[in-house]
Amino acid sequence: MSAMQFKGSIKGRELPAMDEFDANAFLDDFAVSEDPDKPITAGGFRLEAGQSMTYTYTYHEMKLIIDGEITIADDTGQSITATKGDLFYFPSGSTITFSTEDYGMGYFVGQRGVGEA
């Protein structure tokens, strides 16, 4: 039998800059499963006004917008301005562009290991 793991509060946690992008983007992995075959990582993402950020997913991810507003567009031309409570699924292989006029925050769960974003 496996016991649950309490990871503590993530409220107010600082997110490090995603320096590999020319955007005001910040991301941190809060928790990672111990399953080496099918890892799951949960964390936070913040984007502030400035350059947009384009990312190609090499894993499946769900992202819930928890604050602010982020425009999310894919390479098929679909574009949605997301606000608090909006949920997205990004399949592996999808190319997504994130932008905002002010700021937005998301909580994500991805099928990847720690630091593989």
Question: Where are the language model's segments positioned?
Answer:
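A short, N-terminal "cap"/entry segment at the start of jelly-roll beta-barrel domains
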Residues: 1-39
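Short hydrophobic/aromatic-rich beta-strand segments that constitute the beta-sheet cores
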Residues: 54-55, 72, 106-109
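Ligand-binding loop in jelly-roll beta-barrel domains
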Residues: 92-116
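Conserved short histidine dyad/triad with adjacent acidic residue
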Residues: 28-32, 39-57, 84, 91-92
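Short, conserved beta-strand element in jelly-roll/cupin
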Residues: 56-72
